[in-house]
Amino acid sequence: MTQTTESELREKYLDLLSQQFDSPEKLATEIVNLESILELPKGTEHFVSDLHGEYESFQHVLRNGSGNVRSKINDLYAKTLSQKEIDDLAALVYYPEEKLKLVKNNFDSKGKLNVWYITTIEQLIDLITYCSSKYTRSKLRKALPKEYTYIVEELLYKNNEFNNKKSYYETLVNQIIELEQSDDLIIGLSYSIQRLVVDHLHVVGDIYDRGPQPDKIMDTLINYHSVDIQWGNHDVLWIGAYAGSKACLANLLRICARYDNLDIIEDAYGINLRPLLTLAEEHYNGENPAFKPKKRPDKPVGLSKLEESQITKIHQAIAMIQFKLEMPIIKRRPTFEMEDRLVLEKVNYDTNEITIYGKTYPLKDTCFSTVDPQDPGKLLPEEEEVMNKLLLSFQQSEKLKRHMSFLMKKGKLYLPYNGNLLIHGCIPVDENGEMESFEIEGEQHKGRDLLDVFERHVRYAYDYKEITDDLSTDLVWYLWTGKYSSLFGKRAMTTFERYFIEDKASHKEPKNPYYYLREDVDMIRKMLKDFGLNPDEGRIINGHTPVKEIDGEDPIKADGKMLVIDGGFSKAYQKTTGIAGYTLLYNSFGMQLVAHQHFDSRDKVLSDGADELSVRRVVDEELQRKKIRDTNDGKVLQEQIRILKLLMHDRYLN
């Protein structure tokens, strides 16, 4: 069989393309359209990170576009509406269903309510006109409420210059009200505005962790119009569990037990924890203080005595299973350099002490009833059976399968995008800022090359989830806890010490030098270059570590080359940071960093109009307004134009 030449392939490709563009007029129209789009201002990118399962806080930031909605309202109405009216209009756009109920309760006559409907619909139409001013009509149409697209387009493109259609427009709105469609229209318009103020969302890691509703965040992202994800350490932990790593699964369950979030497993994903509870009831007591679950801020009533006791037992059972499961990985992978984490082998079970990193510590709150001192890494038959059942349930959960599939489809370890590098954790470096090497399959890898190899193994483990002890599956676990992991970014994970050793000095997890060298402009420039980006214009946009503004830490580092935007959604960190974190907006005029205050509830926003935002800081302003031509999407369009012009020349101009 003869091979097809490159020239023949080109001809076949052009043949296929000419079926779609079967006349020079059609082809010219498409080229004109694409060339024109290149001249539009670039859309607004919205960067969020470290959501940690905090669905309500994330929803608020998403709905207000990190203050972008209010900014547009202020632009239009600062001189004509009072602050209270602006607050009410903003709350309506954020939470249209709830705000409508409150508004309607305030009117004592239908006539007054109808006047409000007319005014509000007009304001929302004006807002859509303003928010969509840099989009094509085609793109705008996709953002409009489907059921009302025709009506909304008529109102958007109305022209009263000659006064010929005044009564036509009035009748349109009046009939909407008379037919009781105004609530649905207002709701649809509000969601259109939310969509129009943000063109693309970047989630820079950690959708999962200690928060109660990561599943709802995943459902939101699946339905979002344009999104990408850079995996965080907790996201990879969930991917690893689904991909067959029992060590990842045990870690994940332990964290859920610790933060009283086992309902994510049982209720959200439909996984039966009864076998684990039965095992825990048999071997552990419910009073061990080190394993009592943390109190949840969103559960003011708290747990019953029985619930607390059961979770405490589960917490101990899964922690001991985790320590056992990690041992064979460490032993079969010497290049991981993790022998220090063979903790159960370092315990003296007679004296109840451990010798670790050259120092001996007494142990407290121990729960070693299932550990064989002669073979500490050996699982009991019932422990093995429980983990097999849990892994099977995990991999058979339809909802979890959908969520993990989306994480793999939209997610990567890092993303170069519009000249910037988006990464959740770090690029491992030594004390001199030189990129650290890590050996995988006999070869040394560092920087971008290391991250590419890590990602290949994550994808392989996911594709072959029935294999649970191969290198790829072990490397997913290593990404969670290893010292050369770009996601962990520390020298060791001291989980055992935190449970069982009083001396807090043993709890310390020294960070990779990256975190104290990221003020170094030269190091950041070198990294940008390694990832194929322009070091003069590019930036690293980083999540993972909360910015301690309370201590004067600045999220803008290395002369603006490094931006740290841990969203601070996790309520546990807000006492140490002083704020609820940062998000970032990047539009055609430049970048703005937005600091967020603690988010109380949507009820407070609805009643008080509070936006929970503080100052925006301009990171930079573009000397020339950025166009679509200057973006990743622009490069794709330019390549399409090149091919279409080739077709025009080849088929119609000869």
UniProtKB/Swiss-Prot annotation:
It catalyses: beta-D-fructose 1,6-bisphosphate + H2O = beta-D-fructose 6-phosphate + phosphate. The keyword Cell membrane does not apply. It comes from the Bacteria. It is an enzyme of class 3 (hydrolase). The keyword RNA-binding does not apply. One of its GO terms (biological process) is gluconeogenesis. GO terms for molecular function: fructose 1,6-bisphosphate 1-phosphatase activity. This is Fructose-1,6-bisphosphatase class 3. The gene is fbp.
